[in-house]
Amino acid sequence: MKSKAAIAGHPLHPIFVCIPIGLWCFSLPCDLIYHFGWGDDSWKKAALYTLAGGIVGAVPAYITGWIDYGIIREEKTAQVAKFHLILNLLLLPLFIVSVFLRWGETPPYSLWPVIISFFGVVLTGISGYLGGELVSRYGISVHDRHQGPPTKA
């Protein structure tokens, strides 16, 4: 099923999801390094900035994902896509709360933002798995396959 959110035939959603997934997942090791005392305040700042960058980067991923969601017609595929969508709609507010809890935080540092981010990263992994299933198993945003090698016109 070919994506409607594409440039030159290349679907955009798989490109855009790399940004929030990568940044959100990297924020957790930054948090752990800081909270276990293995690094200085720069790790705390890195966690905050990667979370905030992931939130900004999620916007084009959400928009292109929503466009692709609109092309799904098969019921089983729609169920998987709906679960993927719901998880992603939970992720954004979860990470926004984590950012607000960190903003301007002074000692003693709370573990709540780290705990929230941990669950966010777990949900990101589950959602990413489902997104991969939508592409590889259900063919969302995948061009129709050619029947044999290309021929000269």
Regions from the PLM with identified roles:
Residues 1-153:
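Polytopic transmembrane helical bundles with strong interfacial aromatic enrichment
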